[in-house]
Amino acid sequence: MRLVSPLIDYLFASGKMKQVGSYEGSYTKSVYMPFTSNALIGTSYYMAPDTILNSKNNEITAIEVVDNVTNSVAPTVPATDPLSTTQAKQGYFYFCNMKRDVIASVPLYSLIRRLNAGKVQFCNFDDPIVWQNCFIQFDSLATAITTSHSVWLRVTYSPVEN
């Protein structure tokens, strides 16, 4: 124990390690993005501003898409239907910084937890993410996405220590 304690103290002090519990729970937020018109190819659908998910307050650590099958057994039901896996295959989520530079793009389909062996997609970016600059874009619409659909994201975050 004498050997481990100084190492743990060093990692905490240098900010390379944080004390955390489960990656889900009190720091997980559901975000719903309903479509006000039918989705179009190449149109950027930006996230609404959110004080909790703003990178100045919190760091986004994980993200997942809740699809219609997962929602069928979930206790929370949004006003519109979450995307199906077929619809999710057509789009991408873009993580952006303060300058709206794209830091990463991830297929929506790969963010569906039940199709990813039950694992959520973890995030770790050097450049802070600005939630309202992030967007979703579709490169195909073989399966229509209408006003009866929405993108349901579950975002896990960690408070930024000041």
Report the location of each language-model feature.
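Beta-strand-centric surfaces of beta-sandwich/beta-rich domains
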Residues: 1-162
